[in-house]
Amino acid sequence: MKNIHISKDGLLALIKTIPNGRMFSMTFIRKAAKCEHCGKSNQSWNNLERCPICGNILSKTRYSRVQLGVKNPKNCTKPGYGKYIGESGEEALKDGRLKYFDMDVVNKDGSRGCYRQCVIENIRRIHLNGNAYIID
C-alpha cells in the first residue's frame, strides 16, 4: 500500500471523486474515547490513557469500512434505506461533516450497517484504490 500525504483541501477533493456506493475505509478521531475491553465510552475520558472502570487501554480512533451516497443518516437505521442515490459528494460534505454508511456495525436484528456522520476535521486516513491517504 502506498502512503500519500494530503492536505485538508486535498481530502475534500478526494472525497468528491469517490463514486456513490464505492466501498473504502477511513480512520478518524472518536467523539468519545472508548474502552476496547469493556466497551464503555465517555467524552470526559478523552484525556485519559486507560479506562477508569477496568484499567484497559482507551481507543481514541475508529476504523470503519464505509460507503458514500447516504440519503438521510438520522432517519435511516436499516441497511438499504437511502441506497446510493440522491446525494452527491458535495451534499455528503455539507456543514463540515461527512455522511456515510458504516458497514462494520451489527444491529440488534442481525442486519449489518448504520448511517452515520463524522466531522471532516477528525478524519486522519482514507484507504482507497490500494493507497493510504494520510491527512496532514
Task: Indicate where each model-derived feature is located.
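Phosphate-interacting basic helix/loop segments used at nucleotide- and nucleic-acid interfaces
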Residues: 2-24
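Cys/His-rich microdomains that often coordinate metals
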Residues: 39-43, 58-60
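Residues immediately within or flanking Cys/His clusters that coordinate Zn2+
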Residues: 32, 48
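A short, sequence-level motif marking secondary-structure junctions
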Residues: 45-46, 67-76, 119-125
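Short, compact, well-ordered microdomains
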Residues: 95-136
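Short cysteine-rich clusters marking metal-coordination/redox-active sites
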Residues: 35-38, 51-54
